[in-house]
């Protein structure tokens, strides 16, 4: 039976609502007779702002509350930044759709005092704000003379902290800045040879209940095949390494002539050890490429690095 109403669970942050409202508008265009409502809520990751993300714990930090709404029948789908969605989902739920990816790169944002600087020219001891261990480890590897400081809160709050002088610069996702209308604050797109992006960064993931094919049929209009293949390879790589969203694992993926090339990286928190490699194969079988690349990095010592990190940033009781 065709659905007449679709309920979307979403985080209530400004960026999440921009993303969810885009999904809502696109689905309304594709299905004019469908009534779509949004239920916005705060997640654990939204509520705890005085503890580093890695110390809170990793599993479903920004997704668990949304998934609970679907599991009890109060929502049919949930919209996530794909980089926040764990690779192992709760029983009964599935990743139903991956939307077209925007620029997945990290971006440098500076305050007025540092307007003439790029990453390469920041002075010794300049304070870089980031809440991501992935960005932290890679930037420490390339720029050990810089100082790094955790930064939490939504994008607007972070920009206010930057402009008030708490930080010399911030590292943020380019896609998030663009979606919020802050593309003009992007001072430099950080190249992949300096900072590989997060798994799924720049794409949205729509999660849904497994046993409702009518819901899957509705959301599949937003599926972007190229993005989906790239992100499935990236997620398989992350899952095989048993890494979560808050560990120093970075990726880049490209598809050319039906060949998918995946680059992956694991680094120690101090940036002194960084393992990077790539794997290629048929874009029609993306997960096998992610699994192959994870095996390569494990063989080079990635497992030992990740174990050290898990022990070091083990969530506080």
UniProtKB/Swiss-Prot annotation:
The porphobilinogen subunits are added to the dipyrromethane group. It comes from Parasynechococcus marenigrum (strain WH8102). Pfam families: Porphobil_deam, Porphobil_deamC. InterPro entries: HemC, Porphobilin_deaminase_cofac_BS, Porphobilin_deaminase_N, Porphobilinogen_deaminase_C, Porphobilinogen_deaminase_C_sf. GO terms for biological process: chlorophyll biosynthetic process; protoporphyrinogen IX biosynthetic process. Belongs to the HMBS family. It is an enzyme of class 2 (transferase). Keywords: Chlorophyll biosynthesis, Porphyrin biosynthesis, Transferase. Monomer. Its EC number is 2.5.1.61. It catalyses: 4 porphobilinogen + H2O = hydroxymethylbilane + 4 NH4(+). This is Porphobilinogen deaminase. Tetrapolymerization of the monopyrrole PBG into the hydroxymethylbilane pre-uroporphyrinogen in several discrete steps. The keyword NAD does not apply.
